[in-house]
Amino acid sequence: MLNMESAGVSAAMAGLSKSLTTPFSINDILTRSNPETRRMSSVDSEPEPEKLKPSSDRERSISKSPPLCCRDLGLYKLTQPKEIQPSARQPSNYLQYYAAAMDNNNHHHQATGTSNSSAADYMQRKLAYFGSTLAAPLDMRRCTSNDSDCDSPPPLSSSPSESPLSHDGSGLSRKKRSRAAFSHAQVFELERRFAQQRYLSGPERSEMAKSLRLTETQVKIWFQNRRYKTKRKQIQQHEAALLGASKRVPVQVLVREDGSTTYAHMAAPGAGHGLDPALINIYRHQLQLAYGGLPLPQMQMPFPYFYPQHKVPQPIPPPTQSSSFVTASSASSSPVPIPIPGAVRPQRTPCPSPNGQMMSVESGAESVHSAAEDVDENVEID
């Protein structure tokens, strides 16, 4: 007989331990993401009426009389072994555990002789935060054995109207203004008026708003945005122009449109070429020495940089028959053939020079190369 009673007590304690499981166990944490497993575990954790056999007066009072905290809130239905909806099984287990834990405290108060009304009021005040519906989510971090953790209400309430987050969301949605959508005709009229007048007075703004069926605030904001857009576009164009000017390099055109070629030394003296005049004069002097002292076309003064105005050298006249020797100065300025006894003298044909003077050009005959000190001459054979 004692063995039967001990077996019944152990079975009842096992059933109570299964029904009083907390959501902080390893199985609940691992199966939190799987609703099917959680549903099966909640079904398994429900106590069967055969297993819950009270073995003492305290357990008999628990099974017969509903707890005081659940009597007014309608939570006594959770202790009955009838079918519960799947959506409400998980919160019912939490509330069942919480109600059973507080019921033990109530029996402790009865044994010590304290009043049950204060405990019932305390439980009603504690459970009022969770609402009367079972489908409301609960924050079990606040439902521990320590009563000080349950002083503040849970973050989620049963009804959306009572939630502070819903009030904040409605406030944010109320503050957010919808963006006005203008039609093509309204935009065209606004652009036309902006091209005529960038700033509108109060009467002009109200008149235009009435004609376009807009508010004065919309017209004012549109003009402000349009002025800002125009200013930003002008700044971007100015920056692009500065970047283009910094990358621009002066380049001389060497080939004209008609196909003729022009060079820096052939340009007019007053033409704006962007180069240093001293460099141009040095370049002209080198070209003149390369051409044998001949004056370059379109150049009135051969070396205005090296000589003053009254000492500009003139082209050397053609040599005569009596000249048999060449001075060092004439040899350095222009090449003149040196006559050699017994050699055939080449024929010379006079030709006009650009400045109106006569110059001689060698043609026909054969010239002989003669080596002298510090003098080199070129021999041309036709």
From Swiss-Prot:
Changing residue 342 to S: In strain: S-26F, S-94F, S-438S, S-510S and S-521F. GO terms for molecular function: DNA binding; DNA-binding transcription factor activity, RNA polymerase II-specific; RNA polymerase II cis-regulatory region sequence-specific DNA binding; sequence-specific DNA binding. The keyword Signal does not apply. Residues 48-62 have a biased composition (Basic and acidic residues). GO terms for cellular component: nucleus. The keyword Nucleus applies. Is expressed in a segmented pattern in visceral muscle and in a subset of cardiac muscles. Loss of activity results in segmental gaps in midgut visceral muscle. Changing residue 62 to A: In strain: F-96S, F-274F, S-26F, S-94F, S-377F, S-510S, S-521F, S-521S, S-565F, S-968F and US-255F. CDD domains: homeodomain. It is found in: Nucleus. Changing residue 369 to Q: In strain: F-611F. SMART domains: HOX. Residues 175-234 bind DNA. Residues 373-382 have a biased composition (Acidic residues). Residues 27-66, 144-178, 314-382 are annotated as: Disordered. GO terms for biological process: cell differentiation; mesoderm development; mesodermal cell fate commitment; positive regulation of transcription by RNA polymerase II; regulation of transcription by RNA polymerase II; visceral muscle development. Residues 158-170, 321-335 have a biased composition (Low complexity). Keywords: Developmental protein, DNA-binding, Homeobox, Nucleus. Involved in the determination of cell fates in the dorsal mesoderm. Belongs to the NK-3 homeobox family. This is Homeobox protein bagpipe.
